[in-house]
Design a protein with these regions (language model features):
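ATP-dependent carboxylate-amine ligase catalytic core
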Residues: 26-35, 60-146, 158, 162-164, ...
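Acidic, Mg2+-coordinating active-site environments of NTP-dependent enzymes
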Residues: 129, 133, 149-190
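Short active-site-proximal "capping" loops at secondary-structure junctions
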Residues: 45-47, 72-73
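Short functional linear segments
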Residues: 1-43, 50, 56-63, 68, ...
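Glycine- and other small-residue-rich loops at beta-strand/loop junctions that grip anionic moieties
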Residues: 43, 113, 185-188
Length: 190
């Protein structure tokens, strides 16, 4: 699998990430991505279940949905839910080949999560809606580079303090800075 070979070279840690690389890469290549309505999920807890519930709701309304989540438990493929099922190896490899065509040498610059995020956007090009779960959440998250139709904020608590801030207020402020014109915010907060 081409994707596995590529990922074997990547660290899954956030320690050496250039917070602005994803924004620069998207600006450089955004013409290669379709403008599909995106619903972004942000929060400390509850993104996965909220995302899957929302995905199934939209699928029941006969929309074609791509759902990008992290982390995975058993297999990288679990991060990509398309047409009611987890993406298979062939689908991921085809998306990887397309990313190589677009990014060429720039592909190597991306972090594990940035790469996976762009891979999702290629994989979901024929969807009616895309549900993206933020990784680190907030203004510097790889999923925040794309224009979002809506944000859903689940419970916000203490996470990624080295990036988001040391207080709950700082963390919430960082996450809320990327709020789309339409947003739902969970009333159950820490």
């Amino acid at each position: 699998m081409k994707v596995e070979n590529f990922l074997a070279q990547k660290s899954i840690n956030y320690d050496k990430i250039d917070r602005f690389l994803m924004f620069r890469m998207y600006e450089k290549y955004k013409k290669c991505f379709k403008n599909i309505p995106i619903i972004q999920l942000i929060g400390t807890n509850g993104k996965g279940s909220t995302g899957r519930y929302l995905t199934q709701l939209l699928e029941n309304l006969n929309y074609k949905i791509g759902h990008y989540t992290s982390p995975h438990i058993f297999s990288f493929n679990e991060r990509f839910y398309l047409d009611g099922k987890i993406a298979n190896d062939e689908e991921l490899d085809q998306a990887h080949i397309r990313l190589e065509e677009i990014f060429k040498q720039d592909l190597q610059k991306l972090s594990y999560f940035e790469y996976a995020t762009f891979l999702a956007m290629i994989l979901f090009q024929k969807c009616d809606f895309i549900v993206l779960e933020a990784g680190v959440g907030g203004e510097y998250d790889a999923t925040s580079v794309f224009e979002r139709r809506m944000n859903i904020f689940t419970r916000i608590g203490f996470d990624h303090v080295q990036i988001l801030g040391n207080s709950l207020e700082d963390i919430a402020r960082t996450k809320l800075k990327i709020m789309a014109p339409i947003a739902l915010i969970s009333d159950e907060q820490e």
